[in-house]
Amino acid sequence: MLLITGCNGQLGRCLADLLTDAICTDVKTLDITNADEVNKFVKDNNIDLIINCAAYTAVDMAQSDSLNAKKINVDGPKNLAQTGAKIIHISTDYVFDGYGHLPYTPDMQTNPLSVYGQTKREGEIA
């Protein structure tokens, strides 16, 4: 079974519209920052693939709200990954510093310049 997180966001909504058999969640139906809740949800729904579109996306606000940004962008993906389900994690170009050659490729060195970019990079690693 496929799980799409972040279904209230633009990308999550679009994927939910295309992948109509998927289970779609938002922050109200699944708190990805709560490891126990995530594990139970994945187990109870026989999830074997997760597309993680959930994110703290207030780029500028992340500077002053870094704990919440870290909770959502780092701890959330870590909790999802630790379920054992395969995961597709959506990230951002903010993991790069903007000085590289376009297009960015997965093997390029990252160098986030903001709290938002740093948390998204840590989420990739998680």
Positions of the model-derived regions?
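NAD(P)H-binding glycine-rich loop region in Rossmannoid oxidoreductase-like domains
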Residues: 35-72
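Catalytic helix-loop patch of NAD(P)-dependent Rossmann-fold dehydrogenases
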Residues: 71-79, 95-126
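Adenosine-cofactor binding site in Rossmann-like domains, unifying the SAM/SAH pocket
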Residues: 20-41
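Glycine/Thr-rich phosphate-binding loops of Rossmann-like dinucleotide-binding domains
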Residues: 12, 59-60, 97-98
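NAD(P)-cofactor binding segment of oxidoreductase domains
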Residues: 64-88
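Structural signature of beta-strand start/N-cap positions in the alpha/beta core
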Residues: 1, 21, 46-48, 86
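SDR active-site strand-loop-helix element
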Residues: 5, 25, 50-54, 87-92
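N-terminal Rossmann NAD(P)H-binding glycine-rich loop of SDR-like oxidoreductase domains
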Residues: 2-19
